[in-house]
Amino acid sequence: MDPETCPCPTGGSCTCSGECKCEGCKCTSCKKSCCSCCPAECEKCAKDCVCKGGEGAEAEAEKCSCCQ
């Protein structure tokens, strides 16, 4: 497995390392800022991020609860 990728099952927890990049992550909890649903500007609060929302440009802004 590539060290910069990790499994992020839908509805599962994201417990990968800080260097990890989760592709297409749809986690219910995100302990690290690795989840793609947490935009870069929300990295500081991604610790408690809850990934939500659908796909597409409009949904991007609504995906990450830590941005609210």
Swiss-Prot record:
Keywords of the record: Acetylation, Copper, Metal-binding, Metal-thiolate cluster, Phosphoprotein, Zinc
InterPro entries the record matches: Metalthion_dom_sf, Metalthion_dom_sf_vert, Metalthion_vert, Metalthion_vert_metal_BS
Listed SUPFAM superfamilies: Metallothionein
Residues annotated for a divalent metal cation 1 binding in this entry: C6, C8, C22, C25
Annotated binding of a divalent metal cation 4, by residue: C34, C35, C45, C49
Any one Gene Ontology BP term: negative regulation of oxidoreductase activity
Tissues where the protein occurs: Brain.
Region annotation (Alpha) ranges: 31-68
Coiled coil: none
Residue numbers binding a divalent metal cation 7: C51, C64, C66, C67
UniProt modified residues of type Phosphoserine: S33
GO molecular function: cadmium ion binding; copper ion binding; metal ion binding; metal ion sequestering activity; protein kinase activator activity; zinc ion binding
PROSITE patterns named in the record: METALLOTHIONEIN_VRT (PS00203)
Positions of the UniProt region annotated as Beta: 1-30
GO cellular component labels: cytoplasm; inclusion body; nucleus; perinuclear region of cytoplasm; synaptic vesicle
Sequence positions bearing N-acetylmethionine: M1
Alphabetical list of Pfam families matching this protein: Metallothio (PF00131)
Binding site for a divalent metal cation 5: C35, C37, C38, C51
Protein residues bound to a divalent metal cation 2: C8, C14, C16, C27
Binding site for a divalent metal cation 6: C38, C42, C45, C67
Annotated binding of a divalent metal cation 3, by residue: C16, C20, C25, C30
Known role: Binds heavy metals. Contains three zinc and three copper atoms per polypeptide chain and only a negligible amount of cadmium.
Family: Belongs to the metallothionein superfamily. Type 1 family.
Protein's recorded name: Metallothionein-3
Organism: Equus caballus (Horse)
Primary gene name: MT3
